[in-house]
Curated annotation (Swiss-Prot):
SUPFAM superfamilies in UniProt: Ribosomal proteins L15p and L18e
Keywords tagged on the record: Ribonucleoprotein, Ribosomal protein, RNA-binding, rRNA-binding
Phylogenetic classification of the source organism: Bacteria, Pseudomonadati, Pseudomonadota, Betaproteobacteria, Burkholderiales
Annotated Gly residues bias: 21-31
Gene designation per UniProt: rplO
Subunit structure: Part of the 50S ribosomal subunit.
GO CC terms of this entry: cytosolic large ribosomal subunit
Similarity comment: family membership: Belongs to the universal ribosomal protein uL15 family.
Family annotation (InterPro entries): Ribosomal_uL15 (IPR030878), Ribosomal_uL15/eL18 (IPR021131), Ribosomal_uL15/eL18_sf (IPR036227), Ribosomal_uL15_bac-type (IPR005749)
Protein name: Large ribosomal subunit protein uL15
Length: 146
């Protein structure tokens, strides 16, 4: 097999249907749109949610709730992930730089999955009770930012 002899699989490449190009094509005259009516006209289709003049569902139901613009997006990080970073001090910016927290994340909680053998100082992060005990047992500490 050579690159210049490669061909697409049989039947995998179909030609685009050219409608409205004579009766011999099988898709001439009405071009698959049937006879008359709104759907046969160019630009003749209703907007999304239109129910033929009946009061549409999205207007029959009441408005409800809102999306808070100041919502906290909390991420999670495990003790195994902290061990992979292998730095003495870790904060949110370090986690973002190493790809452990996404762009939208504005708070991170450490959970106890795996084990930590190095002393790590966590700045501005929260932790579960088990994770906090494991971090302190390894010689690390949690520092709250004011």
């Amino acid at each position: 097999m050579q690159l210049n002899t490669l061909k697409p699989a049989e039947g995998s490449k179909k030609n685009r249907r050219r409608v409205g190009r004579g009766i011999g094509s099988g898709l001439g005259k009405t071009a698959g749109r049937g006879h008359k009516g709104q759907k046969s006209r160019s630009g003749g289709f209703h907007k999304v949610g239109f129910e033929g003049g009946q009061m549409p569902m999205y207007r029959r139901l009441p408005k409800r709730g809102f999306v808070s613009m100041t919502r906290r997006h909390v991420g999670q990080i495990t003790l195994n992930d902290l061990a992979k970073i292998n730095l003495p001090e870790v904060d949110l910016l370090v986690l973002k730089a190493h790809g452990f927290a996404g762009e939208q994340i504005n708070a991170v909680k450490v959970i106890k999955t795996g084990e930590l053998k190095i002393a790590v100082t966590l700045k501005g992060l929260t932790a579960t009770a088990g994770a906090k005990a494991a971090i302190e047992a390894a010689g690390g500490k949690l520092v709250e930012l004011a």
